[in-house]
Protein backbone atom coordinates (compact mmCIF):
# COMPACT_ATOMS: atom_id res chain seq x y z
CA UNK A 1 0.00 0.00 0.00
CA UNK A 2 1.48 3.36 -0.98
CA UNK A 3 1.66 6.33 1.38
CA UNK A 4 -1.23 8.04 -0.41
CA UNK A 5 -3.50 5.04 0.16
CA UNK A 6 -2.45 4.74 3.81
CA UNK A 7 -3.08 8.44 4.39
CA UNK A 8 -6.45 8.45 2.65
CA UNK A 9 -7.52 5.32 4.58
CA UNK A 10 -6.44 6.80 7.91
CA UNK A 11 -8.05 10.14 7.12
CA UNK A 12 -11.58 8.78 6.95
CA UNK A 13 -13.95 11.73 7.02
CA UNK A 14 -11.25 14.37 6.54
CA UNK A 15 -12.04 17.27 4.27
CA UNK A 16 -9.14 17.74 1.87
CA UNK A 17 -9.48 20.95 -0.11
CA UNK A 18 -6.31 20.70 -2.22
CA UNK A 19 -3.06 18.77 -2.57
CA UNK A 20 0.47 20.15 -2.72
CA UNK A 21 3.03 19.15 -5.35
CA UNK A 22 6.78 19.76 -5.59
CA UNK A 23 8.83 19.29 -8.76
CA UNK A 24 12.59 19.54 -9.25
CA UNK A 25 14.11 18.14 -12.43
CA UNK A 26 15.65 18.93 -15.78
CA UNK A 27 14.07 21.38 -18.19
CA UNK A 28 11.59 18.96 -19.73
CA UNK A 29 8.31 20.90 -19.82
CA UNK A 30 6.29 17.92 -21.03
CA UNK A 31 7.54 15.79 -18.13
CA UNK A 32 6.47 18.56 -15.73
CA UNK A 33 3.01 18.75 -17.32
CA UNK A 34 2.63 14.96 -17.26
CA UNK A 35 3.71 14.81 -13.61
CA UNK A 36 1.20 17.44 -12.50
CA UNK A 37 -1.61 16.01 -14.61
CA UNK A 38 -1.04 12.54 -13.13
CA UNK A 39 -0.83 14.06 -9.65
CA UNK A 40 -4.18 15.78 -10.16
CA UNK A 41 -5.81 12.62 -11.55
CA UNK A 42 -4.48 10.58 -8.63
CA UNK A 43 -6.05 12.77 -5.96
CA UNK A 44 -8.87 14.42 -7.94
CA UNK A 45 -8.31 17.64 -6.01
CA UNK A 46 -7.06 21.12 -6.91
CA UNK A 47 -3.25 21.30 -6.95
CA UNK A 48 -0.97 23.88 -5.37
CA UNK A 49 2.53 23.67 -6.83
CA UNK A 50 4.28 25.14 -3.80
CA UNK A 51 7.80 24.44 -5.04
CA UNK A 52 9.15 23.83 -8.52
CA UNK A 53 12.51 24.41 -10.09
CA UNK A 54 14.89 23.45 -12.87
CA UNK A 55 17.98 21.55 -11.74
CA UNK A 56 19.67 21.44 -15.15
CA UNK A 57 19.05 22.74 -18.63
CA UNK A 58 17.38 25.86 -20.01
CA UNK A 59 15.23 27.36 -17.25
CA UNK A 60 14.13 30.29 -19.47
CA UNK A 61 12.52 28.04 -22.07
CA UNK A 62 11.08 25.76 -19.40
CA UNK A 63 9.29 28.66 -17.69
CA UNK A 64 8.07 30.08 -20.99
CA UNK A 65 6.35 26.75 -21.62
CA UNK A 66 5.05 25.80 -18.20
CA UNK A 67 3.82 29.12 -16.78
CA UNK A 68 1.11 29.72 -19.43
CA UNK A 69 0.17 26.05 -19.23
CA UNK A 70 -0.27 26.19 -15.43
CA UNK A 71 -2.31 29.38 -15.75
CA UNK A 72 -4.61 27.58 -18.20
CA UNK A 73 -5.29 24.61 -15.90
CA UNK A 74 -8.36 25.29 -13.75
CA UNK A 75 -7.18 22.66 -11.25
CA UNK A 76 -3.83 24.38 -10.59
CA UNK A 77 -4.79 27.06 -8.09
CA UNK A 78 -1.35 28.31 -6.99
CA UNK A 79 2.29 27.94 -7.92
CA UNK A 80 5.62 29.24 -6.65
CA UNK A 81 9.09 28.93 -8.13
CA UNK A 82 11.47 27.77 -5.42
CA UNK A 83 14.89 29.24 -6.16
CA UNK A 84 14.64 32.94 -5.32
CA UNK A 85 17.94 33.85 -3.58
CA UNK A 86 20.58 36.02 -5.30
CA UNK A 87 22.83 33.80 -7.41
CA UNK A 88 25.01 33.65 -10.50
CA UNK A 89 23.22 30.41 -11.37
CA UNK A 90 20.65 31.20 -14.04
CA UNK A 91 18.12 28.95 -12.33
CA UNK A 92 17.35 31.51 -9.61
CA UNK A 93 14.90 34.42 -9.87
CA UNK A 94 17.26 37.07 -8.43
CA UNK A 95 20.53 38.17 -10.05
CA UNK A 96 23.85 37.80 -8.22
CA UNK A 97 23.90 41.44 -7.08
CA UNK A 98 20.57 40.95 -5.32
CA UNK A 99 19.28 44.16 -6.89
CA UNK A 100 17.48 42.91 -9.98
CA UNK A 101 15.62 40.01 -11.50
CA UNK A 102 17.50 37.36 -13.42
CA UNK A 103 16.32 36.39 -16.90
CA UNK A 104 13.99 33.77 -15.46
CA UNK A 105 12.90 36.20 -12.75
CA UNK A 106 11.69 38.53 -15.49
CA UNK A 107 9.86 35.68 -17.22
CA UNK A 108 8.21 34.65 -13.94
CA UNK A 109 7.24 38.23 -13.06
CA UNK A 110 5.53 38.84 -16.39
CA UNK A 111 3.71 35.51 -16.61
Model-identified regions with their sequence ranges:
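Substrate-binding cleft of secreted/luminal carbohydrate-active enzymes
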Residues: 50-111
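Structural recognition of alpha->loop->beta junctions
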Residues: 7-20, 67-77
Amino acid sequence: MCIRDRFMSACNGCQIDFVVAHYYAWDNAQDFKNYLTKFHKTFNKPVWVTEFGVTSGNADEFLKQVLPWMDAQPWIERYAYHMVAPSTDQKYLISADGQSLSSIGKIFATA
